[in-house]
From Swiss-Prot:
Cofactors (names): a divalent metal cation
Site (Important for dimerization): 173
Gene3D superfamilies, per the entry: Coproporphyrinogen III oxidase, aerobic (3.40.1500.10)
Record protein name field: Oxygen-dependent coproporphyrinogen-III oxidase
Catalysed reactions, semicolon-separated: coproporphyrinogen III + O2 + 2 H(+) = protoporphyrinogen IX + 2 CO2 + 2 H2O
Binding site for a divalent metal cation: 94, 104, 143, 173
Uppermost EC category: oxidoreductase
Family according to the record: Belongs to the aerobic coproporphyrinogen-III oxidase family.
HAMAP family in UniProt: Coprogen_oxidas
Native source organism of the sequence: Methylobacillus flagellatus (strain ATCC 51484 / DSM 6875 / VKM B-1610 / KT)
Amino acid sequence: MNPTAIFDYLQGLQTRIVEAIELVDGKRFLHDSWQRAEGGGGTSCMLEEGNVFERAGIGFSHVIGNKLPPSASVAHPEAAGRSWQAMGVSLVFHPRNPYVPTVHMNVRFFVAEKPGEEPIWWFGGGMDLTPYYGFEEDAVHFHRTCRDAVAPFGEQYYPRFKKECDDYFYLKHRKEARGIGGIFFDDFNELGFEQSFAFQRSVGDAFINAYLPIVQRRKDIPYSERERDFQAYRRGRYVEFNLIYDRGTIFGLQSNGRTESILLSMPPIVKWRYDWKPEAGSPEARLYSDFITGRDWLTEHK
């Protein structure tokens, strides 16, 4: 096990993604390095009021603690209470144009240790897409890129982690999906350290190709106040999910994490409406009927 190699990879991944987004947007990220009193620190990179992105945050963190909160692992309750290290890169990009989808990506590593015992470690991560106005071409491209990232490790991983993603990014109180999914994995160590780390790298390295071609296709589509209004309404679902269900948010708050970094995923403008329903047959209604339904995009588009 080599946490230093993971640390170096994650820092490099953050830098590569920041540079790629700056090329598309034309505006620079603010870099905010921070330290955590209990141990560790990180760098939060934030782009606000950009040309393409209204708010884009990508954070690297490496935090250390003496007692692991239970929220850190559903599958490894025996790790609770051990000393621990957690490191990861997490991003959420909220575009200005409603025809460009919001995206989330995260890759992370946990290790929990106790003197005289074997360390308990695992990787987690994934990426998922949240369109406001859906395009089948974009959904297929995103899912195909996710599949290709994990295929070298076994054909079973894409369908397994697509289902994990669909199940995880689901708002139970709304009975609806947050978006069109992607892949999601957690508590992952079944390939041994080196191959599990390679799996994580493959997912992280796939992000730019999964998302930026979609941004380039959609960022110049004309839109009106109607589309912006629906975008703000749907962003409300993003806020609800992150504050109620998201394990990273809950873990960060339980472990006395840095609030500004934990909440960098929040959209800048959000609206709620009482019992609103889209007009039948409208492009807004099509999002619900045709896109956020857990479709098997790659079986449909072989």
